Amino acid sequence: MGAFPSPPPWGWSTGFITTPLTTGRLPSQHLDPALPKLFWFTPTLPTCPTVAKQFWDTKRTSPDGNLKVANLPSFAISFATAPAALANCPPLPRVISMLCMAVPKGISVEVDSSFLSKNPFPNCTSFFQSIRLSRCI
């Protein structure tokens, strides 16, 4: 047996059969051949948040040709507060750096407290009480 593997069968690609390129390299190049030397001197990860940018208006056209425009106050705006001074220090109490979502004030669901105090289904309680009484008899 020689140093090279046997040739592939007739018609096969030989692109994946090659000799290793480890001969003639320094020991430091054997450990990390794909990483550049500047990789170890750069900071690890960015500590500033990425904030999505909003346009003044959003135009959408449906397949049937209808054009809809949403102006700035009509959709939610996402924003992030400033992060902590250092990535390894926790933020101050009651001051956290996290993504917040501001929902437009025009779209809100409010429930009237007088609605909750009233029974919306007055016949249901008498119906369930009659079932309970009929089982006892």
Swiss-Prot record:
Q: Which locations, inside or outside the cell, does it occupy? A: Plastid, Chloroplast
Q: Name one GO cellular component term.
A: chloroplast
Which coarse location class applies to the principal site listed for this UniProt protein?
Answer: plastid
Q: Which UniProt keywords apply?
A: Chloroplast, Plastid
What family name appears in the similarity comment?
Answer: Belongs to the ycf72 family.
Q: What is the name attached to this protein's record?
A: Uncharacterized protein ycf72
The scientific name of the source species is Saccharum officinarum (Sugarcane)
Organism phylogeny: Eukaryota, Viridiplantae, Streptophyta, Embryophyta, Tracheophyta
Q: Which gene encodes it?
A: ycf72-1
